[in-house]
């Protein structure tokens, strides 16, 4: 009888720990304070501001630098629009971008991890993809401001 109670109690503790872990893993939501601001990487910058109701105002500017016999050159690209966010991940399609363009913004560990699929029309070799670091939490100035 004593062994049965011990097994039962052990199973209940394991089940409780599993449920708590599952909840912690699935609750990856971020606050406006965590997403708001200016994020930078070597070749690009995102300006992001929470609008409420799971929507973000987003503006991207990127550059691809290269050397030519005439000297250094650069291709530049920009995109702006609204993104929808669920938990820690936002989906952004810049206004006027190709249909297959999709930019995924994942806010994780104090960083912004960006993946890009499709042609987004930023310019030759200009991509939003990369890991960005927050450089300011202030409300950014957007091109439309």
Give the predicted meaning of each segment:
Residues 27-102, 133-137:
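Central antiparallel beta-sheet cores of small beta-barrel/beta-sandwich binding domains
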Residues 2-45, 98-100, 115-145:
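Amphipathic/hydrophobic helical signal segments and adjacent flexible N-terminal regions
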Residues 112:
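Basic, alpha-helical nucleic-acid-binding regions used in initiation and control of genome expression
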């Amino acid at each position: 009888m004593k062994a049965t109670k011990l097994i039962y109690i052990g199973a209940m503790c394991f089940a409780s720990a599993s449920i708590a872990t599952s909840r912690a893993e699935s609750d990856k939501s971020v606050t406006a304070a965590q997403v708001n601001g200016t994020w930078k990487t070597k070749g690009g910058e995102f300006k992001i501001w929470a609008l409420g109701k799971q929507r973000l105002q987003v503006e991207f500017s990127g550059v691809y630098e290269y050397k030519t016999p005439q000297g250094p050159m650069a291709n530049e690209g920009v995109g702006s629009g609204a993104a929808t966010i669920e938990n820690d991940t936002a989906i952004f399609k810049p206004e006027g971008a190709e249909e297959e363009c999709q930019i995924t913004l994942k806010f994780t560990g104090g960083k912004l991890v960006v993946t890009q699929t499709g042609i987004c029309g930023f310019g030759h070799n200009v991509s939003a993809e990369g890991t960005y670091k927050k450089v300011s939490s202030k409300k950014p100035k957007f091109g439309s401001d």
